[in-house]
């Protein structure tokens, strides 16, 4: 059996549609067949900082008090790399890159 395709779900960003992108990411995550695909969630804060988010954090994004959700400012930034076989994403902690994962497809609602 071959490895599952890894999808990077990228959402948020420096846009007036930030909250809508977050809500759309929740819907997309719910629709992805997790038996066939692995998902890496990457949120972009309103200030433009990229971060890895757990799938549980994404699933919990909701409208609250009439306000759309926001990607929080990250403690550690996510970075994109060109890997041996294509794209990779990693988390930068100080001067080190940790949790490096290959990515096959990027989906940005």
PLM features: what roles do these ranges have?
Residues 1-109:
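ATP-binding N-terminal substructure of ATP-dependent carboxylate-amine bond-forming enzymes
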């Amino acid at each position: 059996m071959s490895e599952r395709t890894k999808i990077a779900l990228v959402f948020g960003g420096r846009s007036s549609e930030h909250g809508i992108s977050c809500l759309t990411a929740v819907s997309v995550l719910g629709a992805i067949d997790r038996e066939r695909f692995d998902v890496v969630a990457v949120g972009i804060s309103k200030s433009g900082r990229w971060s890895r988010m757990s799938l549980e954090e994404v699933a919990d994004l909701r409208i609250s008090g009439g306000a759309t959700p926001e990607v929080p400012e990250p403690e550690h930034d996510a970075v994109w790399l060109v890997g041996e076989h294509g794209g990779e994403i990693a988390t930068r902690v100080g001067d080190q890159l940790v949790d490096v994962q290959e990515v096959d497809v990027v989906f940005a609602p």
